[in-house]
From Swiss-Prot:
Its cofactor is Fe cation. Involved in the catabolism of homogentisate (2,5-dihydroxyphenylacetate or 2,5-OH-PhAc), a central intermediate in the degradation of phenylalanine and tyrosine. Catalyzes the oxidative ring cleavage of the aromatic ring of homogentisate to yield maleylacetoacetate. Residues 92-111 are annotated as: Disordered. The lineage of its organism: Bacteria, Pseudomonadati, Pseudomonadota, Betaproteobacteria, Burkholderiales. It comes from Burkholderia vietnamiensis (strain G4 / LMG 22486) (Burkholderia cepacia (strain R1808)). Keywords: Dioxygenase, Iron, Metal-binding, Oxidoreductase, Phenylalanine catabolism, Tyrosine catabolism. This is Homogentisate 1,2-dioxygenase. Pathway: Amino-acid degradation; L-phenylalanine degradation; acetoacetate and fumarate from L-phenylalanine: step 4/6. The gene is hmgA.
Length: 444
């Protein structure tokens, strides 16, 4: 049996966010009534994968028990990976992380590679904060690839990977089973989970937020009530699937921002059954239940929050993943696009498809922008003039779009690559320079 990544998956998914799942690819492969029997069914090995401390409170504790053909320890020693490496995991001052300018920054899309490039080889770090070694903060990567991973497997020990495809589907094989992900969906691969990515459409491009800190969770809804935003039932986790395949394979590990490789003589996708609440999942952003004003004003963008990584300060998240999906705008006598803003938090934005309603041009699918702490930002001149004159007695639908934001409590520091790349738009600031002075003290 193999996890055939050459065609779409046929198995279904398990529904729910953070559930205690139990799934087996062979009948009776899950031990009954215990986690680690003296002899596991089918001659399997029992292995626990811990995503939090053993003593974390029950509501935050994440772990899974895997029943596999060989333990994860079975591989040759790691050695430095000699292929292309453009990753950063420490965001203090260094050759990779120069002083952070207060300028608003915007980039064109990462070009598609000319040479054959898989998902791992196509990764590049654009920005981040904190430290993978200290397990706080995040790294923001882009990827551009044009070939599937071949006899190669990958995992990150640095953090969980929130993957946002922008172009091209991803067929992702993991130790837990299969995820098929397309643009307008996201996938989350937990820290330490081994996976491989196939590209059924050839070229693929997208964004990744690698979360070094507390695991992503659904936000509390407060006065919204018991339903709304991203509903738990719409998060999908793989059913158990396995392959018993031997050969000359390569296992790549990411640790403290560096890539390492080891020879491995079998596929690590040999988990026949598993149970627990620490597992990969995907979510369709088009299912987000958008909340907005039906009277006046544009509410704070926290109403668009999909997932959060909490910090030690109540009400202040380390990372927020926010989307700006299709939605109706109905507020009267209101400037409907996102307003002009300076923020104590820092904002890295991307665009999956369509146009963002605060920028008439320049911010294109696959591109990105960074507005750091207290850097002024907001609609460009054309957007402001149009929105200031529109008839707000009639509702308007923002359609055929999907923008998103990684917002963090601490400064997002662009890497040397991000500041030196030809994709950096040197004229981004010009979009605000044509904003006119309308002030007249004689006319209210």
């Amino acid at each position: 049996m193999t996890l055939d990544l050459s065609k779409p998956a046929t198995a279904g998914y398990l529904s729910g966010f953070g559930n205690e799942f139990a799934t087996e690819a062979l009948p009776g492969a899950l031990p009954h009534g215990r986690n680690s029997p003296q002899r596991a069914p089918y001659g399997l090995y029992a292995e626990q994968l811990s995503g939090t401390a053993f003593t974390a409170p029950r509501g935050h504790n994440r772990r899974a028990w895997l029943y596999r053909i060989r333990p994860a320890a079975v591989h040759r020693p790691f050695e430095p990976f000699t292929g292309r490496q453009r990753l950063v995991a420490e965001f203090g001052d260094s050759a990779d992380v120069p002083p952070t300018p207060p300028n608003q920054l915007r980039w064109d899309p990462l070009p598609m590679p000319v040479e054959p490039t898989d998902f791992v080889e196509g990764l590049v770090t654009m920005a981040g904060n904190g430290s993978a070694a200290a397990m706080n903060g995040c790294a923001i990567h882009l990827y551009a690839a044009n070939r599937s991973m071949q006899d190669r497997f990958f995992y990150s020990a640095d953090g969980e990977l929130l993957i946002v495809p922008q172009q091209g589907r991803l067929f992702i094989a993991t130790e837990f089973g299969r995820l098929d992900v397309e643009p307008a969906e996201i996938a989350v691969i937990p820290r330490g989970v081994r996976f491989a990515v196939a590209l059924p459409d050839g070229d693929a491009r997208g964004y990744i937020c690698e979360n070094f800190g507390a695991l992503l969770r659904l936000p509390d809804l407060g006065p919204i009530g018991s339903n709304g935003l991203a509903n738990p039932r719409d998060f999908l986790t793989p059913q158990a699937a396995y392959e018993d395949r031997e050969g000359a394979f390569e296992l790549i590990a990411k640790l403290n921002g560096r890539l390492w490789r080891a020879d491995i003589g079998h596929s690590p996708f040999d988990v026949v059954a598993w149970h627990g609440n620490y597992a990969p999942y995907k979510y369709d952003l088009r299912l987000f239940n958008t909340i907005g004003s039906i009277s006046y004003d544009h509410p704070d963008p926290s109403i668009f929050l999909v997932l959060q990584s909490q910090s030690d300060s109540p009400g202040v998240d380390a990372i927020d993943f926010v989307i700006f999906p299709p939605r109706w705008l109905a507020a009267e006598d209101t400037f409907r696009p996102p307003w002009f803003h300076r923020n104590v938090a820092s904002e890295f934005m991307g665009l999956v498809h369509g146009a963002y309603d605060a920028k008439a041009e320049g911010f294109v699918p696959g591109g990105a922008s960074l507005h750091n702490c207290m850097s002024g930002h907001g609609p460009d001149a054309d957007t402001f003039e149009k929105a200031s004159a529109i008839d707000t007695t009639r509702p308007h639908k923002v359609d055929a779009t999907m923008a998103f934001m990684f917002e963090t409590r601490t400064l997002i520091r662009p890497t040397r690559y991000a500041l030196d790349t030809a994709q950096l738009q040197a004229d981004y600031f010009e979009c605000w320079q044509r904003i006119e002075k309308h002030f007249n003290p004689e006319q209210r």
